[in-house]
C-alpha cells in the first residue's frame, strides 16, 4: 500500500475506500519487517491500532474529521509523547516515561494524526550521522553501508523508507535539513519561534526548532499549519499569524524571482557530484523565469566555530539536570552523592555528548567567557545582519544542503571536526534564526541523494515550500 501524498490518502479515507485501521496495520507490518534497520526505538503497536479504530468510528458516526485525519507519523525520540518512553537515544534516560505531550504532539493529535512510534537519533540531538545513539546506527535507505545523516536520521530514514508518511524532527544546526538531503526527502526548519518547543528536550535553547520531514512539500505545509503558532507554555514562540501555507505556496511565481547564490556555498572543496546536481536545479529555476544573483556572505567561514561555542555552552547548562538523582540512569558504583552524580553522568552519556558538555563548560569559564562565548555572540549578530542585508536584495538564498553526499558508517567517527563540517551550509540559517529547508536535488553518479537548501526571510516558510515544490515538479517531468 503506497500513497504519493497525504491528500491522496485523505481522499481515500474520507470516501471509506480504505480504513484508518488498514493503513496503520500496513505501516506497522512494514516497520516489523524492517526492524533490523533500527529506525524505530519504540513502536506504538497497540496504541496506534487503537487510535486508528477510534478514528474509523468517528468517521462512521458522521463527526468532522481533523485536518490530518489518519496521517501516519513518526516522532523523533527527543519529543514528549505522554505515557511513552523518552530516551533522546541516551542511556542516561533509561526507563524514563514522559508525563505530558509536547505542544506539537498535542496539536497533531487534536487534528487526528496517528503516531506510529518514536524514531532513532543522535544522542540528545548531537551529531550528523545518527551514529551517536545508545541504540546503534541507522543505515541510509539508499545504501545500507552509509549514514542517513543526523541528528534526525531516524526521522529521515522513516519517511524515505516508507515507514511513516511524515516525521517530526528537531533542528539545532541542520539536524532536519542535512538528513533530509542524505535521504532524498523534504526537510523544513521553520523560523525560530514558529513552532513551540514545549516538550522538546533542550540541546541549544536559542537554536532548537522542531522541524518536519516528508516526501513532498504539500505534506510539510499541512503539518506546519497545524503545529505552528503561539503557545503560552513557550515564551519564545511567536505570535506571528499562521497563514494558509498551501495557499501561499500556490501564489509563488518563479518569474522575476531573485535567487541569491553565495559563492561561499560553492568552494573548491565541494563534492563535484553535489555541485553538479545543485547547479542543474538552479539552472532549471532560471529556465522557469527566476534570476540567479551572485551574492557574498564572507563571514560564513566563522559559522561552525561560532555555532559550536554557543550551542555547547547552552548544552552544558541544559544537560546539567541529568544527574541520576531524579529520573533515568543511576550508577550503582558510588559511595556518596557526589560520586553518584559523577558516575551516573560518566556512564550515562555517550562520548560526543560528554565532549560537547566539556567544551561548553570551558567556553563559559571565567577566564575564557570574553574570549570565546562573548565573541561568538557578536559573530552571531553579524551573521543576522549579513543575511538580512542579502535577503533585502534577493527573495531566497540557495545552495547545497551538505558539502558531500552520505558518507560511510564509521568513516568520520574518529574525526569529530570532519563530522562537524557536514553542517557547514546549514548552520548559518540556525545562527540567524531564519527558516530553511532541504529539497531533493537529484543524485550523484553513485546514485546517492543530493539536497538543495533554500533559506528565506523570517516567516517565509510558504515561499520556501512553494519554490521547493517547483523544484520537485521539474524533476518529475
UniProtKB/Swiss-Prot annotation:
<dbReference type="InterPro" id="IPR000120">
    <property type="entry name" value="Amidase"/>
</dbReference>
<dbReference type="GO" id="GO:0006412">
    <property type="term" value="P:translation"/>
</dbReference>
<dbReference type="InterPro" id="IPR020556">
    <property type="entry name" value="Amidase_CS"/>
</dbReference>
<dbReference type="GO" id="GO:0030956">
    <property type="term" value="C:glutamyl-tRNA(Gln) amidotransferase complex"/>
</dbReference>
<keyword id="KW-0547">Nucleotide-binding</keyword>
<dbReference type="InterPro" id="IPR036928">
    <property type="entry name" value="AS_sf"/>
</dbReference>
<keyword id="KW-0067">ATP-binding</keyword>
<keyword id="KW-0436">Ligase</keyword>
<feature type="active site" description="Charge relay system">
    <location>
        <position position="76"/>
    </location>
</feature>
<dbReference type="InterPro" id="IPR023631">
    <property type="entry name" value="Amidase_dom"/>
</dbReference>
<dbReference type="GO" id="GO:0005524">
    <property type="term" value="F:ATP binding"/>
</dbReference>
<dbReference type="GO" id="GO:0050567">
    <property type="term" value="F:glutaminyl-tRNA synthase (glutamine-hydrolyzing) activity"/>
</dbReference>
<comment type="subunit">
    <text>Heterotrimer of A, B and C subunits.</text>
</comment>
<feature type="active site" description="Charge relay system">
    <location>
        <position position="151"/>
    </location>
</feature>
<comment type="function">
    <text>Allows the formation of correctly charged Gln-tRNA(Gln) through the transamidation of misacylated Glu-tRNA(Gln) in organisms which lack glutaminyl-tRNA synthetase. The reaction takes place in the presence of glutamine and ATP through an activated gamma-phospho-Glu-tRNA(Gln).</text>
</comment>
<protein>
    <recommendedName>
        <fullName>Glutamyl-tRNA(Gln) amidotransferase subunit A</fullName>
        <ecNumber>6.3.5.7</ecNumber>
    </recommendedName>
</protein>
<feature type="active site" description="Acyl-ester intermediate">
    <location>
        <position position="175"/>
    </location>
</feature>
<dbReference type="Pfam" id="PF01425">
    <property type="entry name" value="Amidase"/>
</dbReference>
<dbReference type="InterPro" id="IPR004412">
    <property type="entry name" value="GatA"/>
</dbReference>
<comment type="similarity">
    <text>Belongs to the amidase family. GatA subfamily.</text>
</comment>
<keyword id="KW-0648">Protein biosynthesis</keyword>
Amino acid at each position: 500500500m503506497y500513497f504519493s501524498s497525504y491528500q491522496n490518502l485523505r481522499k481515500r479515507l474520507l470516501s471509506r475506500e480504505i480504513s484508518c485501521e488498514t493503513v496503520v496495520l500496513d505501516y506497522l507490518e512494514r516497520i516489523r519487517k524492517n526492524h533490523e534497520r533500527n529506525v524505530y526505538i519504540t513502536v506504538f503497536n497497540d496504541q496506534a491500532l487503537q487510535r486508528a479504530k477510534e478514528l474509523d468510528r468517528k468517521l462512521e458516526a458522521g463527526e468532522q474529521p481533523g485536518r490530518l485525519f489518519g496521517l501516519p507519523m513518526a516522532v523523533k525520540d527527543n519529543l514528549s509523547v505522554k505515557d511513552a518512553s523518552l530516551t533522546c537515544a541516551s542511556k542516561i534516560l533509561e526507563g524514563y516515561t514522559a508525563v505530558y505531550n509536547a505542544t506539537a504532539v498535542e496539536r497533531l493529535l487534536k487534528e487526528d494524526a496517528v503516531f506510529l512510534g518514536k524514531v532513532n537519533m543522535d544522542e540528545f540531538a548531537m551529531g550528523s550521522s545518527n551514529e551517536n545513539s545508545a541504540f546503534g546506527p541507522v543505515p541510509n535507505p539508499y545504501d545500507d553501508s552509509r549514514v542517513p545523516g543526523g541528528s534526525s536520521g531516524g526521522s529521515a530514514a522513516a519517511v524515505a523508507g516508507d515507514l511513516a508518511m511524515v516525521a517530526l524532527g528537531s533542528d539545532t544546526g541542520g539536524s532536519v535539513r542535512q538528513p533530509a538531503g542524505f535521504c532524498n526527502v523534504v526537510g523544513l526548519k521553520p523560523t525560530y519561534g514558529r513552532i513551540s518547543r514545549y516538550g522538546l528536550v533542550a540541546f541549544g535553547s536559542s537554536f532548537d526548532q522542531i522541524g518536519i520531514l516528508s516526501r513532498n512539500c504539500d505534506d510539510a505545509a499541512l503539518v506546519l499549519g497545524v503545529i505552528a503558532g503561539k503557545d503560552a507554555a513557550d515564551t519564545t514562540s511567536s505570535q506571528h499569524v499562521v497563514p494558509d501555507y498551501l495557499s501561499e505556496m500556490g501564489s509563488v511565481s518563479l518569474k522575476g524571482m531573485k535567487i541569491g547564490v553565495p559563492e561561499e556555498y560553492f568552494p573548491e572543496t565541494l563534492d563535484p557530484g553535489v555541485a553538479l546536481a545543485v547547479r542543474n536545479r538552479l539552472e532549471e529555476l532560471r529556465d522557469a523565469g527566476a534570476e540567479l544573483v551572485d551574492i557574498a556572505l564572507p563571514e560564513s567561514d566563522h559559522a561552525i566555530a561560532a555555532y559550536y561555542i554557543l550551542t555547547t555552552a547552552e548544552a552544558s547548562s541544559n544537560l546539567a539536570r541529568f544527574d541520576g538523582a531524579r529520573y533515568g540512569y543511576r550508577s550503582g558504583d558510588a559511595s556518596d552523592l557526589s560520586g553518584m552524580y559523577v558516575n551516573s553522568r560518566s556512564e550515562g552519556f555517550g562520548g560526543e555528548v560528554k565532549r560537547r558538555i566539556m567544551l561548553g563548560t570551558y567556553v563559559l569559564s571565567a577566564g575564557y567567557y570574553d574570549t570565546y562565548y562573548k565573541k561568538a555572540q557578536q559573530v552571531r549578530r553579524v551573521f543576522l545582519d549579513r543575511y538580512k542585508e542579502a535577503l533585502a536584495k534577493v527573495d531566497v538564498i540557495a545552495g547545497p544542503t551538505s558539502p558531500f553526499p552520505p558518507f560511510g558508517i564509521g568513516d568520520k567517527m574518529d574525526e569529530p571536526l570532519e563530522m562537524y563540517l557536514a553542517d557547514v551550509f546549514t548552520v548559518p540559517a540556525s545562527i540567524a534564526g531564519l527558516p530553511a529547508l532541504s529539497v531533493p536535488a537529484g543524485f550523484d553518479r553513485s546514485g546517492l541523494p543530493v539536497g538543495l537548501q533554500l533559506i528565506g526571510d523570517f516567516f517565509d516558510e510558504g515561499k520556501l515550500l512553494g519554490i521547493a515544490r517547483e523544484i520537485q515538479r521539474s524533476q518529475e517531468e
